[in-house]
Curated annotation (Swiss-Prot):
<dbReference type="InterPro" id="IPR046938">
    <property type="entry name" value="DNA_clamp_sf"/>
</dbReference>
<keyword id="KW-0235">DNA replication</keyword>
<protein>
    <recommendedName>
        <fullName>DNA polymerase sliding clamp</fullName>
    </recommendedName>
</protein>
<dbReference type="InterPro" id="IPR000730">
    <property type="entry name" value="Pr_cel_nuc_antig"/>
</dbReference>
<dbReference type="Pfam" id="PF00705">
    <property type="entry name" value="PCNA_N"/>
</dbReference>
<comment type="function">
    <text>Sliding clamp subunit that acts as a moving platform for DNA processing. Responsible for tethering the catalytic subunit of DNA polymerase and other proteins to DNA during high-speed replication.</text>
</comment>
<dbReference type="GO" id="GO:0006272">
    <property type="term" value="P:leading strand elongation"/>
</dbReference>
<dbReference type="InterPro" id="IPR022648">
    <property type="entry name" value="Pr_cel_nuc_antig_N"/>
</dbReference>
<comment type="subunit">
    <text>Homotrimer. The subunits circularize to form a toroid; DNA passes through its center. Replication factor C (RFC) is required to load the toroid on the DNA.</text>
</comment>
<comment type="similarity">
    <text>Belongs to the PCNA family.</text>
</comment>
<dbReference type="InterPro" id="IPR022659">
    <property type="entry name" value="Pr_cel_nuc_antig_CS"/>
</dbReference>
<dbReference type="GO" id="GO:0006275">
    <property type="term" value="P:regulation of DNA replication"/>
</dbReference>
<dbReference type="GO" id="GO:0003677">
    <property type="term" value="F:DNA binding"/>
</dbReference>
<dbReference type="GO" id="GO:0030337">
    <property type="term" value="F:DNA polymerase processivity factor activity"/>
</dbReference>
<keyword id="KW-0238">DNA-binding</keyword>
<dbReference type="Pfam" id="PF02747">
    <property type="entry name" value="PCNA_C"/>
</dbReference>
<dbReference type="InterPro" id="IPR022649">
    <property type="entry name" value="Pr_cel_nuc_antig_C"/>
</dbReference>
Amino acid sequence: MPFEIVFEGAKEFAQLIETASRLIDEAAFKVTEEGISMRAMDPSRVVLIDLNLPSSIFSKYEVDGEETIGVNMDHLKKVLKRGKAKDTLILRKGEENFLEISLQGTATRTFRLPLIDVEEIEVELPDLPYTAKVVVLGEVLKEAVKDASLVSDSIKFMAKENEFIMRAEGETQEVEVKLTLEDEGLLDIEVQEETKSAYGVSYLADMVKGIGKADEVTMRFGNEMPMQMEYYIRDEGRLTFLLAPRVEE
């Protein structure tokens, strides 16, 4: 099924793909008249990724019917990284088994990427009984993960009324990032009960890679439960992660 999809701002799209490529090697993108979606798990089955890009965020979206295209994420990332912030990204597929990627700026550069067979995973995002919901600025989360990586391979999230703490403890060092609603970095917090859970720093570092400093990031978690993290792409698109907890001894 042929299609032509245009996205203004190639670099922003590239950042999305780079974030996912840090966690998965290949992906099956479902292209429908409503938009583009992708769901995948990392090889260790610790992180579930769910991407949803409605047709409304694209400047041109000509799709007739439905098709699933499989791509090597590393190859796709490398091509998209050649785009500049003001470049226009054009995705086309004809009858051949290739994805055509054009980057339109001071010149038009076109790449042809072979499509591959990728098994689609039939995994639903579980409806978990989260006891804490926290909304923070992307900059705060990115810096906290960087700080934690200096001292430990895990970071503990703790939420109670009007307070969210991210803490990492190593053998000789520790770091704590504390936020209340009086701080600019904490935008909202809803807590049903005092909640604590730990997560792997390396996975979080990959998950936050594509988040902008001013992006609003929503995290939902429970005691020793998976954490759901999501942020919006141009208000209507959404990238969601589900990260398994690090159960401490």
